[in-house]
Amino acid sequence: MELVILDCHDLTAEQIVDYMIELNPDLRSLIKRQKVYVGVTGNIEERLNRHNAKRILFCARTASQRVAAEVERVAVARGFNIGKVTHGGNGTNSHSIYVYAYEID
């Protein structure tokens, strides 16, 4: 299956999270069960391979690292999982303009 990366460069972080939920009807149920991991990266294919993500729910390019980091913060506030991190994110760099979400096995 080819990875589809949506262009969300003209959306705010809140709009991107809303769009993610709108595109995936079963996402709310998965979030309630802590089964959706969300992250930010500069190389989306490498990161998804590293996570061994099987069911990719959302991939998008944002306008900037700042927007991508804000998407992660908003998603976490809405119940998405970011792993064993307590500070609200796994860190980003200036190339981290992609956001992704996948179903946790």
Per-range role (PLM):
Residues 1-105:
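GIY-YIG nuclease catalytic motif and its immediate N-terminal context
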